[in-house]
């Protein structure tokens, strides 16, 4: 192709002088890109008006713009689409060329960026620690990483996890060295969520969510478990209790079986359960080791005469499919005039069952370890049990929960003091218990227990 010195079309072109840098396109370290039309890398041009990358063949289709630069070509040579010829234009070339120091710095920054990305590939995020490939990275890039807030946060998390792992190992030693022979396990709704039973207080899935409040026109969200409101209108409770009632569809979780394993090993003093779903019973935790502090669906009674009714009788009412039939179970005794039957669960406004008060003081005196699992520690008096074992008694306390709870300066958890005996495993409580059993070398026993129960 011939090269003409002048082109009449240049004066009418809208060259993007601010963004286009011809020196960058001529840099031998830059890989030739593909044509956006045909993906070819032959005779590649860059439009100096819009920046689009196109081959010589397809640039004819790019008829709106005229002037193009050839990749890795003579930096004085341009291609005019309208003239269909190569042209020489020094003035425009100079305007489209940036300071070499600036472009070299940009290229260096890009190079560093890719090295940082390379380091992230080498960075073992799963184990939260640098692996041996870190040594192969340039020292200059290591400095970039060390000054990065992101990596600083990762390293901080790594250090915190390492500290927690070391503390948990201390807790493991206490159990393995027979320092914990009378363990109290305090459990809440969180241990049954994996069974499909909603956590009362969960905003999205809990029974206290706004949808249920609106649906049943409740005066306040906790009214469904308020004893005075139940006496006034038991319908909302029984409608919502379909999600809670033991109907055979809910299975025990690893946490339930872990507590059973503690009992089998003779280490469980008591399980204080805040759940009424009876899964502790189903898991096989002995009744003499179990305090259902908030009652249980296992037994129901007439609110008038106290006659006891079976779970089957209650289920027939709750799960009936007749839209004309109430879900509220009623007493069959004629003299009771269809009095409401209430399960033996503790409503707001009711006292805890006698078995709680009969055992709590003696259990506190005998307890040598407290494990708290899956609870918000918001409901009294159960929430105060943590305070019964203050730091100065050196009784180990382990919190297994999806978030830190129960921290305060009045006998609550204090995880920031490495000298005390407070431990935590924050995350999914089922996974945490499986990890705990593995650290104790109980994982095989726990899995065997889970499998044997599930096959029965």
From Swiss-Prot:
- The active-site annotation reads 294 (proton acceptor)
User: What UniProt keywords apply to this chain's record, in alphabetical order?
Assistant: Metal-binding, NAD, Transferase, Zinc
| Leader peptide range in chain numbering | none
Q: Which Pfam families match?
A: SIR2
Q: What is its EC number?
A: 2.3.1.286
Which cofactors are required for activity?
Zn(2+)
Q: Which residues form the Deacetylase sirtuin-type domain?
A: 161-443
Q: How is the cofactor bound?
A: Binds 1 zinc ion per subunit.
One GO term of the biological process aspect: rDNA heterochromatin formation
Give me the reactions it catalyses.
Answer: N(6)-acetyl-L-lysyl-[protein] + NAD(+) + H2O = 2''-O-acetyl-ADP-D-ribose + nicotinamide + L-lysyl-[protein]
* Chain positions recorded as Zn(2+) binding sites: 302, 305, 331, 336
Matches recorded under SUPFAM superfamilies: DHS-like NAD/FAD-binding domain
Q: Read off the InterPro entries from this record.
A: DHS-like_NAD/FAD-binding_dom, NAD-dep_sirtuin_deacylases, Sirtuin, Sirtuin_cat_small_dom_sf, Ssirtuin_cat_dom, Znf_RING/FYVE/PHD
The family classification in the record reads: Belongs to the sirtuin family.
Q: In UniProt terms, what function does this protein have?
A: NAD-dependent deacetylase, which plays an important role in the regulation of transcriptional repression.
Q: What is the protein name given in its UniProt record? A: NAD-dependent deacetylase sir2C
């Amino acid at each position: 192709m011939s090269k003409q010195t002048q082109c009449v079309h240049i004066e009418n072109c809208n060259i993007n002088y601010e963004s286009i840098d011809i020196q960058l396109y001529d840099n031998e370290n830059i890989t030739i890109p593909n044509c956006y039309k045909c993906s070819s890398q032959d005779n590649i041009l860059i439009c100096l008006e819009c920046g689009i990358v196109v081959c010589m063949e397809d640039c004819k289709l790019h008829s709106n713009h005229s002037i193009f630069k050839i990749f890795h070509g003579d930096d004085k040579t341009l291609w005019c689409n309208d003239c269909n010829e190569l042209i020489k234009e020094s003035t425009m070339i100079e305007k489209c060329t940036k300071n070499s120091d600036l472009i070299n710095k940009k290229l260096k920054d890009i190079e560093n960026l890719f090295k940082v990305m390379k380091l992230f590939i080498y960075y073992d995020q799963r184990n939260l620690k640098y692996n041996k490939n870190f040594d192969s990275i340039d020292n200059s890039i290591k400095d970039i990483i060390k000054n990065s807030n992101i990596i600083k946060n990762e390293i901080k998390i790594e250090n915190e996890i390492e500290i927690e792992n070391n503390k948990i190992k201390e807790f493991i030693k206490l159990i393995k060295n027979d320092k914990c022979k009378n363990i109290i396990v305090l459990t809440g709704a969180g241990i049954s969520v994996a069974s499909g039973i909603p956590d009362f207080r969960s905003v999205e899935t809990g029974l206290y969510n706004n949808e249920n409040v609106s649906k049943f026109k409740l005066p306040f969200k906790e009214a469904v478990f308020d004893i005075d409101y139940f006496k006034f209108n038991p319908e909302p409770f029984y409608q919502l209790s379909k999600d809670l009632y033991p109907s055979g569809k809910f299975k025990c979780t690893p946490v339930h079986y872990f507590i059973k394993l503690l009992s089998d090993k003779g280490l469980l003093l008591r399980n204080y359960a805040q759940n009424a779903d009876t899964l502790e019973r189903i898991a096989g935790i002995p009744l003499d080791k179990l305090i259902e502090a908030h009652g249980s669906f296992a037994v129901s009674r007439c609110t008038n005469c106290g006659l006891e009714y079976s779970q089957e009788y209650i289920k027939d009412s709750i799960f009936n499919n007749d839209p004309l039939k109430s879900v509220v179970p009623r007493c069959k005794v004629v003299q009771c005039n269809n009095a409401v039957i209430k399960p033996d669960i503790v409503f707001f406004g009711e006292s805890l069952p006698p078995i709680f008060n009969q055992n709590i003081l003696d259990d506190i005196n005998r307890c040598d370890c407290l494990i708290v699992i899956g609870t918000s520690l918001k409901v009294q008096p159960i929430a105060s049990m943590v305070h019964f074992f203050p730091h100065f008694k050196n009784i180990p306390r382990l919190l297994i929960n999806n978030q830190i709870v129960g921290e305060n300066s009045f006998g609550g958890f204090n995880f920031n003091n490495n000298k005390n005996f407070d431990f935590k495993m924050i995350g999914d409580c089922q996974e945490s218990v499986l990890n705990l059993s593995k650290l104790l070398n109980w994982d095989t026993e726990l899995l065997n227990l889970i499998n044997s129960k599930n096959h029965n």
